[in-house]
């Protein structure tokens, strides 16, 4: 038993997996008590919604259900790790452009923000931005306030974000030309 502890547990690659897991930050967004009606009465359980990210541009969310809260959270975390998405960030702190996303009746509007703005977002969206590594963003949710719809709408918006490289490829120009236009456009806007 002591030898197993020294090697990192019973599972293969235990120590390596712990190091991989430590790079992720997870946030519990929502926990819900659910009931299944059976012949003998009601059987209670819990559903958890977790967002996980490495604060460097990768983020995912997961949903887990179990009879006990810790088990539901563990299942949701495992599900989130399997559904990671890479999101391009501008200067490693904000979005490249303003975007909108929707899922069901939930709609979200995300705006890139200047340095020092902070995360101006409510509830589930804030958890996504914190785990993603975004430091400056302004977000607004309209319609459904259901956390599941808000998370999915946020992911829909992030999925539709274009990096400067993809925009440059689409327009057949160099990224440096595109960036120069962006900087020039900002200078013209501030001069007015």
UniProtKB/Swiss-Prot annotation:
GO biological process: translation
Region named Disordered: 1-21
Disulfide bonds: none
Organism listed in the record: Afipia carboxidovorans (strain ATCC 49405 / DSM 1227 / KCTC 32145 / OM5)
Physiological role: With S4 and S12 plays an important role in translational accuracy. Located at the back of the 30S subunit body where it stabilizes the conformation of the head with respect to the body.
Lineage of the species this protein comes from: Bacteria, Pseudomonadati, Pseudomonadota, Alphaproteobacteria, Hyphomicrobiales
Entry remark concerning the domains of this protein: The N-terminal domain interacts with the head of the 30S subunit; the C-terminal domain interacts with the body and contacts protein S4. The interaction surface between S4 and S5 is involved in control of translational fidelity.
Gene from which the chain derives: rpsE
Gene Ontology molecular function: any one: rRNA binding
Superkingdom of the source species: Bacteria
Alphabetical list of PANTHER family matching this protein: MITOCHONDRIAL RIBOSOMAL PROTEIN S5
NCBIfam families attached to this UniProt entry: rpsE_bact (TIGR01021)
Name assigned to this protein: Small ribosomal subunit protein uS5
GO cellular component, as recorded: small ribosomal subunit
